[in-house]
Amino acid sequence: MQVTRIIPDVPSFLASMMTFDTWSILFMVVQSLVIFLVVVIVAAMMIIYERRMLALWQDRYGPNRVGPFGSLQLVADMLKIFFKEDWTPNFTDKFMFTLAPAVAMFTALASFAIIPISPTLGVADWDIGILFFFAMAGIAVYAVLFGGWASANKFSLLGGLRSAAQTISYEVFLGLSLMGVVALTGSFNLRAIVEAQADGWYIIPQFFGFLTFVVAGVAVTHRHPFDQPEAEQELAEGYHVEYSGMKFGMFFIGEYVNVVLISALMTCLFFGGWLAPFNLDIPFIPPAFWFMIKTLFFMTMFVLARGSLMRPRYDQVMNFGWKVCLPVTLINLLVTAAVILIFSPTL
């Protein structure tokens, strides 16, 4: 009697499932996970890089006790924050209190999906890339609002309100500052914007847009000197004063991920992304090298700003945005549009 085999051979079944499209999707997922992991590692390493650079500029040693020349300080910090008590106060809204750091971390990492590291390396190649970035930035505002309100602490609430007002205001200037680049390129796709700079980086025709983008980028990431939402002297660390353990770590790493993100956007929008300077053609240097060098330069500028600039008052920050940044971005956009109409009337 012959028995009909109903269950197929498992290896052959899996092999039949692994079509070309399946392998493509699997490769894309693995590549995305690797890129996100590298971004988190770079953001964590920037913490130590910042501490060592600030120590160098201030004529002191910095962290140098854990490992040779302090090389294992990052590992020690990660272990310390991982094993700290993840304490939630009784008077908080526990759901919102837990959701806030997760939203902050998720939006920061998700925004990296649009960043083209090289012609072939990146998570997604979307025509709405810049719009996706602003969508994630808009959602990120809720993270600090949730954290400030759910903590049931007056310092947290004031820090959350400050952060929301500052972020929403400077996101307007951030968007207007790069509209000149979008007008020159005719695309919201970052890969197309980088490729359009093959004949010249946009830092020259969009210099004032770049300056406004730098200021707005620092304000949106809540970095010094625009760190009023976390002002230690006034608000005792602001909206995350009640956080500890990994929840605080997610807020902390999320801030540095945003610094890397804004630095990468500056590289792509104004400095040619992965393109070599002066159209140099050096075969043994991959395009991703130029992208990383430019991004590291802007990350260093964030550190330099922290070590050299004083923190203005909150009202001065808001006045500077609406009375200086907004007019500059609007004038830059109008001049860019006029130049395009005069020299390219068919567009």
Curated annotation (Swiss-Prot):
Entry's Gene Ontology molecular function annotations: NADH dehydrogenase activity; oxidoreductase activity, acting on NAD(P)H, quinone or similar compound as acceptor; quinone binding
The keyword Cell inner membrane belongs to this UniProt entry's keyword annotation: yes
InterPro entries (UniProt xref): NADH_UbQ_OxRdtase_su1/FPO, NADH_UbQ_OxRdtase_su1_CS
Enzyme class: translocase
UniProt GO BP: aerobic respiration
EC number: 7.1.1.-
Presence of the UniProt keyword Transmembrane helix in the record: yes
UniProtKB keywords: Cell inner membrane, Cell membrane, Membrane, NAD, Quinone, Translocase, Transmembrane, Transmembrane helix, Ubiquinone
Cellular component aspect of the GO annotation: plasma membrane
Pfam family, one: NADHdh
Location relative to the cell: Cell inner membrane
Family, as annotated: Belongs to the complex I subunit 1 family.
PANTHER family: NADH DEHYDROGENASE SUBUNIT 1, NADH-UBIQUINONE OXIDOREDUCTASE CHAIN 1
Subunit description: NDH-1 is composed of 14 different subunits. Subunits NuoA, H, J, K, L, M, N constitute the membrane sector of the complex.
Name of this protein: NADH-quinone oxidoreductase subunit H
Organism, scientific name: Psychrobacter cryohalolentis (strain ATCC BAA-1226 / DSM 17306 / VKM B-2378 / K5)
Lineage of source species: Bacteria, Pseudomonadati, Pseudomonadota, Gammaproteobacteria, Moraxellales
